[in-house]
Amino acid sequence: MSQQKKGIGLLVSAIGVVFGDIGTSPLYALKETFAGHHPIPVTPDNIFGVLSLVFWTVMLLVTVKYVIVIMRADNHGEGGSLALLALVTELTRGRRVHYPLMMLGVIAAALFYGDSMITPAISVLSAVEGLEVVTPDLKAYVVPITAVVLTLLFAIQSRGTGLVGRLFGPVMCMWFLTLALLGIANIVHAPEVLEAISPTFAIEFVFRHPLMSFYALGSVVLAVTGGEALYTDMGHFGRFPIRLAWFGLVLPALLLNYFGQGALLIHDPSAIQNPFFRLGPEWMVVPMVALATLATVIASQAVISGAYSVARQAIQLGLLPRMTIVHTSGEEAGQIYVPFTNWTLYFAVMALVVGFQSSSNLAAAYGIAVTGTMMIDTILVSFVAALLWRWHPVVVAVVIGTLLLLDFAFFAANIIKVAQGGWFPLFIGFISFTVLTTWRRGRALVRKQLKKQAVPLDVVLRALGPNVSRARGTAVFLTAATDGVPPALLHNLKHNQTVHQRVILTTVSTAETPYVPDSERVHMTDIGDGFHRLIIRYGFMQTPDVPAALSLCKQFGHEFNMMSTSFFLSRETYVPSLNPGMALWRERLFTFMTLNATRATTFFKIPTDRVVELGTQLEI
């Protein structure tokens, strides 16, 4: 295949995956602004003011902030809140701001899960609601149809989405072309709406109606939901294809459609009940509902896949316990399925659909998670600009300060919607933050306890006398510590009075980069007396495979035969106590998560028939 064809294929794929969320925003953004919980009178002045706000919000928050500025802050090609967090963590190590910034990154990851629950619900609901334009009698079927579509979507996740994924690009290309054509068809009847490109309309609207415009910001931000996906998916497609797709198709199509809806409302204010599905003739409504449903399913799929990816990153970065990760493609390493994440999302999405009943009710819940994440991204990237890009402090203050001011304005406009549904992402964010920080703190306490009980390796080596027999073969002891003796080895010595001829003390560590190449995967040192220390390194986007890593040790003169290799694991049982460190309820939560974590043998892909587990009890 020629480079040109590969480039076109990558571009079409990027359009299918990256822009699904922001691409389906025209279904509800303008409708919610004029007819939502804080409705705005549909007058020409207000239409021009809102259109100007939408235009400049998209240009500043997506084009300038994400496409031009933040997409430069890649972590070895990867993007997203956790990749940005890992980059900032590395840059600020040893500084006072290190811990607060790390907590901000964790909050962003927590808010992401609230967002990933709301997106499938609001997207598919808004598409199916188009049936109400055909006849109001179909309103009763909107929620059941939405539930069926989403159930099928989540049910097929375990089979992989490779085959269906090939259709994503062409379908979304058709979607964006349809958005553009519908917009143009209405703009020709009221071309004066294009004057709203001037920022003076937005400024006048804000000064004439300060309270109304503040409420409007809470809905206008719906036009940029999914903008952060441009940065999140950068690792899959690269910076250039995403930028090319944005400027070449997605941005023009979105703006044309919003201005087309504005032109429609100038001629027919009653169309505000569902302006998107009123853009075309009546015969087009049903085909448009079908196309919109496909587009929203694709948008939902992108968010679900993103949730799997964030879960894997969080596990690797020590923020979540081990979970089962299934690779659904033999060709694409990034195509994974995380059962726990999938079904947690499914039940949450179903609860939202049944509980909120309409996209308008859900819109109030949507903005908080998105604006909160965007604001944190801006704060984190300010440190990248200052410490990595070496921007002048004045440039950082002006550029990042302006973006942060905009982020805060949108966040403030959404935080007032707590009672209307904004409580949901805050609740999910709080639960997620508690889980992430409890696991991180619990693991730190465990490491501290193990270090306190650790016996120096040289003491053990000196104690190896004639009473200790040497068994044939190799023993691999997995340990989180890079010094001292693993508890499993001490237990083996104490109870069996034997040590293997070759002992490999193995630590699997996660780098603050997305990928570690095979050439840098393993590092082995000879300690003496048949003992060796092995460090296996993986990136936070990779899944550990200990047997595969052992096969790379040939460069150190070591070969491993699985039939003569035994793996020794220490299985700790944690006992909550009143010792200082964590609140008792958090210790119990940590213990519960540990008991339900995927077994180390499964997670590290170790043959179960070659494993010996030795138990130990720890107070935390």
Swiss-Prot record:
GO cellular component: plasma membrane
Keyword Transferase attached: no
Record localization: Cell inner membrane
Keywords: Cell inner membrane, Cell membrane, Ion transport, Membrane, Potassium, Potassium transport, Symport, Transmembrane, Transmembrane helix, Transport
Highest taxon, organism lineage: Bacteria
Any one GO MF annotation of this record: potassium ion transmembrane transporter activity
Major location category of this protein: membrane
Transmembrane regions: 7-27, 50-70, 102-122, 136-156, 168-188, 211-231, 246-266, 284-304, 336-356, 368-388, 393-413, 415-435
Membrane topology: Multi-pass membrane protein
A matching Pfam family: K_trans
Catalytic activity line of the entry: K(+)(in) + H(+)(in) = K(+)(out) + H(+)(out)
Function: Transport of potassium into the cell. Likely operates as a K(+):H(+) symporter.
Family statement drawn from the similarity comment of this UniProt entry: Belongs to the HAK/KUP transporter (TC 2.A.72) family.
Record protein name field: Probable potassium transport system protein Kup 1
Organism field: Rhodopseudomonas palustris (strain ATCC BAA-98 / CGA009)
